[in-house]
From Swiss-Prot:
Region (Disordered): 1-43
PANTHER family (UniProt xref): EUKARYOTIC TRANSLATION INITIATION FACTOR 3 EIF3 -RELATED, EUKARYOTIC TRANSLATION INITIATION FACTOR 3 SUBUNIT B
Name of protein: Eukaryotic translation initiation factor 3 subunit B
Keyword rRNA processing tagged: no
Species of provenance: Xenopus laevis
SMART domains: RRM
Primary gene name: eif3b
Known function: RNA-binding component of the eukaryotic translation initiation factor 3 (eIF-3) complex, which is involved in protein synthesis of a specialized repertoire of mRNAs and, together with other initiation factors, stimulates binding of mRNA and methionyl-tRNAi to the 40S ribosome. The eIF-3 complex specifically targets and initiates translation of a subset of mRNAs involved in cell proliferation.
Length: 688
């Protein structure tokens, strides 16, 4: 029985196999005869083909270097070593080609990098590299030659742009009363106003809502007012404060002007990328063009770039490097940075292209302060220092003196002492004098246009202020010292001689007004919780203020004379910031200024007469203003009465014919009251 079943099973299995073969033939995935595939290689092999060599890959990585020395075979190897040393800094060199003719090189070479980005970096940084007195490299991408060869012969004349007349950008200097302007931000930043200063009350010039999103800043000479916006910076100026220029820099937070007002530096933490540095941008103010972008290190302090006094150079410090750039090219001076191991800080002289920097101690090598002349990079003075903890550089406004505040720990002692190293910059070989103080230093400040400096030292509550004078023979004399001062900041008048000792914030706004000609305290006052002190550019007035940004109540600014007499108290809702508008340097020579000071008594009589006339003028202006207000009220009253009478018919219809005007009038209950006020006038006899 089992044997009889076997054939049947075999037949069944064979039948199943034949069915499977038939199904496989019906489901065949083979292409029919004559089939043409319309799928491209890019669709099938896109991930592989994207890495295939491109025709332009090699060309994009090739640079051409001109003005290379022409040498023979005996010096070719040496030339190659020099070229590799210079250009390998920008990336890996894969090929070099030195064309030759008649036994020497032709003066230009071809270099190929591993990546196009490396070639672009070489062009950017090596173009203009000075090899020696006779050879300055000109570096271009090889692809640039094709680009410039296909330029057509036809030239399209650019459209002439209309001239934008912004008016007189220094119109505020022509004020007949020689007043100064200042900006005020209040209502927690929603409103910004510009005022003329006046003894009685500020005179408004311009007021706008949401003029800036954070704060404002004046340019160094007062020409422009900068406002901050999420999309960038706007500059305003002229009599009506029209928009002069705008710079698009998303998320900008900080700015800085060059001293010459030609360039603007902006910083945004949002824009930086590895491919295109945009964290810091330097702009040309006149054209609005982006001159150059830079990366920003996370540990940097603003301003990252520091400008020379004339705006010709700017510099930045990175690890063991001081990079100095020149304008208008925005390239590195001499195409290379200064390698200064351990450099901690640097500062430009306000009176010349001299840069000061200091380096801390390193094992047995002492700390040193170096003065270097630019652009020659000549060291004009080096000062070695020992046991140094920290140094601070303080320049006098004219660059006549440099004070290096040196904190050090003498051997064998646990405490710290401070030396003031005074460099006399205008004398041969730059002699240095030293003042030593054992107290802790709170503040130091030079007299702007003189040879005195003030120091706050000690600890609360025994804080002292000392005044020193640098004599012509180099001797530093202590003029005066006051004990028990409530101050943590020194504010010199821009013209010198007078200063304010202020105890800001935690010291509750204590103020001392000092005349340093004889070191007398002219007045002691207080502006409770004051956060800021601002001198006007002429040194006539001082403003103290309580900013809403630091203290949420009692927000106001007070105006004082330089002698400490309070003139005004101006309360502004959520007052934030006040800044005086700077003035450009005087056009008068020093001899002319001395002559004016000599004849000051003669001019003072004229000024006193003008003050009296201004008071009389103010009274007349008050009368005219009140008359104008009365006329405005009368006009409005007549218009309202006319409208009221025109609507009487409609009122009667609404109220069913009842004249409610008569019901509500109650004329018999009215009381009439007359108010009189008297305005005095001063009559000044004019002598013939």
């Amino acid at each position: 029985m089992l044997e009889s079943e076997r054939p049947e099973r075999d037949m069944e299995e064979e039948g199943e196999e034949s069915n499977e073969e038939e199904e496989e033939e019906g489901m065949s995935f083979s292409d029919p005869e004559g089939f043409e595939d319309d799928i491209s290689d890019e669709e099938l092999l896109g991930d592989i083909l994207k890495d295939r060599p491109q025709e332009a890959d090699g060309i994009d990585s090739v640079i051409v270097v001109d003005n290379v020395p022409q040498v023979g075979p005996d010096r070719l190897e040496k030339l190659k070593n020099v070229i590799v040393k210079i250009f390998s800094k920008f990336g890996k060199l894969t090929n070099e080609f030195y064309p030759q003719a008649e036994g020497s090189t032709k003066g230009y070479i071809f270099l190929e990098y591993a990546l196009p980005a490396q070639a672009q970096d070489a062009v950017k940084n090596a173009d203009g590299y000075k090899l020696d007195k006779q050879h300055t490299f000109r570096v271009n991408l090889f692809t640039d030659f094709d680009k410039y060869m296909v330029i057509g012969d036809e030239w399209d004349v650019p459209e002439k742009q209309p001239f934008k007349d912004f008016g007189n950008l220094r119109s505020w200097l022509e004020d007949p009363d020689c007043r100064d302007q200042f900006s005020v931000i209040y209502e927690s930043g929603d409103r910004t106003s510009i005022f003329w200063t006046d003894v009685k009350e500020p005179v408004p010039v311009e007021e706008r809502a949401r003029w800036t999103e954070t704060y404002v800043r004046w340019s160094p000479k007062g020409t422009y007012l900068a406002t901050f916006h999420q999309r960038g910076i706007a500059l305003w100026g002229g009599e009506k404060f029209k928009q002069i220029q705008r710079f698009s820099h998303q998320g900008v937070q900080l700015i800085d002007f060059s001293p010459c007002e030609r360039y603007l530096v902006t910083f945004s933490p949002l824009m930086d990328t590895k491919e295109e540095p945009q964290a810091i941008i330097i702009w040309d103010i006149l054209t609005g063009h982006n001159k150059r972008g830079f990366h920003c290190e996370s540990s940097a302090h603003w301003p990252i770039f520091k400008w020379s006094h004339d705006g010709k150079f700017f510099a930045r410090m990175t690890l063991d490097t001081l990079s100095i750039y020149e304008t208008p090219s925005m390239g590195l001076l001499d195409k290379k940075s200064l390698k200064i191991t351990g450099i901690k800080d640097f500062s430009w002289s306000p009176g010349g292209n001299i840069i000061a920097f200091w380096v801390p101690e390193d094992k047995d090598i002492p700390a040193r302060v170096t003065l270097m002349q630019m652009p020659t990079r000549q060291e004009i003075r080096v000062r070695n220092l020992f046991n140094v903890v920290d140094c601070k550089l303080h320049w006098q406004k004219n660059g006549d003196y440099l004070c290096v505040k040196v904190d050090r720990t003498p051997k064998g002692t646990q405490g710290m002492v401070t030396n003031f190293e005074i460099f006399r910059m205008r004398e041969k070989q730059v002699p240095v004098d030293v003042v030593e103080m054992k107290d802790g230093i709170i503040a130091f400040a030079w007299e702007p246009n003189g040879s005195k400096f003030a120091v706050l030292h000690g600890e609360v509550p025994r804080i002292s202020v000392s005044f020193y004078h640098v004599k012509n023979n180099g001797k530093i004399e202590l003029i005066k010292m006051y004990d028990k001062q409530q101050a943590n900041t020194i504010f010199w008048s821009p013209q010198g001689q007078f200063l304010v000792l202020a105890g800001l914030r935690s010291m509750n706004g204590a103020l001392a007004f000092v005349d340093t000609s004889d070191c007398t305290i002219m007045n002691i006052a207080e502006h409770y919780t004051a956060s800021d002190v601002e001198w006007d550019p002429t040194g006539r007035y001082v403003i103290t203020s309580v900013s809403w940004w630091s203290h949420k109540v009692d927000n106001a600014y007070w105006m004082w004379t330089f002698q400490g007499r309070l003139l005004q108290k101006n309360n502004k809702d959520r007052f934030c910031q006040l800044l005086w508008r700077p003035r450009p340097p005087s056009l008068l020579s020093q001899d002319q200024i001395k002559q004016i000071k000599k004849d000051l008594k003669k001019y003072s009589k004229i000024f006193e007469q003008k003050d009296r006339l201004s008071q009389t003028k103010a009274s007349k202006e008050l009368i005219e203003r009140r008359r104008a207000m009365m006329e405005e009220y009368k006009t409005y009253r007549e218009m309202a009465t006319k409208l009221y009478m025109e609507q009487k018919t409609a009122r009667l219809e609404i109220r069913g014919g009842v004249d409610t005007d008569l019901l509500d009038s109650n004329v018999e209950d009215w009381e009439e009251e007359t108010i009189e006020f008297f305005v005095t006038e001063e009559i000044i006899p004019v002598e013939e």
